[in-house]
């Protein structure tokens, strides 16, 4: 073969190889990176790990349906260690890796520290659980979005349970001493006043997030003889189970009432029989209507069980829904840009989600009804809606 023909032949082979490679790239587009920052170690570590599993289960469902903008989702998970400085470091790390969205926020102090960092980077930030009202104040992130009930919403639901469910007059508070705990207690007391409920605060004990020994505090509460003791503790892996056990061991009189979203099956599993009798309020239960018969929720529950052998609790549903809302908005608007997606979610409505058909308030707060429950024989027994 002469040199000219050989050159054209090699060029043809190269072109064919390039075309073949381009075809492969078209079939396997680059994934869209989704960042997740939650506690994966320490007291809240088990719950953070479960939420991460739920997000991965939802990612699998979304990818099977075509992904986001025709591209698969790749979930990058980081441990914030329930520490603000670590959360900020993890946020910067994920931003550097080019994530399109960050799903974060178990602890309010950590979420509040991360918010301005993520906002300055121009990355969409969806807060899952951090319930401090400051999360949606606009100071750290003017385009904030949150799924879990706010302190105000949770406080109103707990106040309703105190006033109408238990008709408690003598109230004791066992409160986590941070933005979440203090804000939640203030919201509960504001809710009681809004209901014109006549009550007396007979005891108030505060503690740090990492505390697991509440015997001295509960001894003081026992001496106050409360009708209802409100436990406000976001450390569901360590602190809340300890409160349940020590409350029963200390023979504290009256009803133990947990703040919204702080008693899940994982908490009950750790606390054992001491969890029986505790009351609370929450926003999601996988096997209770209207969720039990919802086809979208059923698919999510089935996928979570298949992938991780775990039935989702409220924490897991919130994590999955955060990814779902983002994916729905991105596919609808055909963009990954932070501002249009945030404006679509804030004040917007979505059909066919894990939570059913839902809406967000203009400030970015997901609007969901709450349901009162008690724990009996190691299981959550839902009573009736406690408010919206």
Kindly give the residue locations of the regions a language model identified.
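Beta-alpha junction/loop-to-helix N-cap segments that form part of ligand/metal-binding clefts
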Residues: 46-53, 61, 68-138, 207-214, ...
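Extracellular/periplasmic periplasmic-binding protein-like sensory domains
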Residues: 244-320, 379-387
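N-terminal secretory signal peptides and thylakoid transit peptides that target proteins
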Residues: 1-15
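Periplasmic-binding protein-like
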Residues: 94-106, 126-128, 172-175, 225-236, ...
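Extracellular/periplasmic Venus flytrap/periplasmic-binding protein
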Residues: 88-89, 133-134, 142-251, 289-299, ...
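Extracytoplasmic "Venus flytrap"
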Residues: 31-54, 78-85, 106-107, 174-183, ...
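Segments of small-molecule ligand-sensing domains
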Residues: 303-317, 325-380
């Amino acid at each position: 073969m002469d040199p000219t023909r050989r050159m054209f032949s090699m060029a043809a082979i190269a072109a064919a190889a390039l075309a073949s490679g381009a075809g492969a790239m078209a079939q396997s587009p680059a994934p869209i990176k989704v960042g997740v920052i939650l506690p994966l170690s320490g007291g809240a570590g088990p719950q953070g790990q479960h939420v991460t599993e739920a997000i991965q289960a939802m990612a699998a469902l979304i990818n099977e349906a075509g992904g986001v903008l025709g591209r698969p989702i790749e979930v990058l998970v980081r441990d914030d260690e329930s520490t603000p400085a670590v959360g900020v470091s993890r946020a910067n790390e994920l931003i550097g890796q080019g994530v399109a969205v960050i799903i974060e926020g178990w602890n309010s102090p950590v979420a509040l520290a991360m918010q301005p960092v993520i906002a300055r980077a121009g990355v969409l930030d969806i807060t899952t659980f951090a319930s401090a009202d400051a999360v949606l104040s606009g100071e750290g992130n003017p385009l904030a979005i949150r799924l879990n009930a706010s302190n105000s919403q949770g406080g109103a639901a707990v106040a309703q349970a105190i006033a109408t469910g238990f008709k408690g007059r003598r109230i004791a508070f066992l409160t986590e001493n941070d933005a979440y705990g203090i804000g939640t207690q203030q919201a509960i007391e504001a809710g009681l006043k809004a209901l014109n409920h006549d009550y007396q605060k007979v005891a108030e004990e505060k503690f740090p997030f990492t505390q697991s020994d509440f015997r001295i505090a509960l001894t003081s509460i026992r001496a106050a003889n409360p009708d209802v003791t409100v436990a406000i503790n976001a450390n569901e892996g360590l602190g809340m189970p300890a409160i349940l056990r020590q409350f029963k061991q200390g023979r504290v009189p009256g009803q133990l009432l947990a703040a919204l979203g702080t008693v899940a099956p994982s908490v009950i599993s750790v606390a054992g029989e001491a969890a029986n009798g505790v009351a609370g309020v929450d926003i999601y239960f996988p096997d209770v209507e209207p969720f039990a018969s919802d086809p979208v929720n059923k698919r999510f529950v089935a996928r979570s069980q298949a992938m991780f052998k775990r039935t989702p609790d409220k924490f897991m549903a919130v994590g999955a829904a955060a990814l779902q809302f983002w994916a729905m908005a991105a596919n609808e608007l055909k963009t990954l840009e932070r501002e249009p997606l945030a404006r679509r979610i804030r004040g917007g409505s979505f059909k066919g989600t894990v939570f059913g058909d839902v809406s967000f308030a203009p400030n970015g707060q997901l609007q969901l009804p709450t349901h009162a429950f008690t724990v009996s024989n190691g299981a959550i027994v839902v009573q009736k809606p406690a408010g919206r």
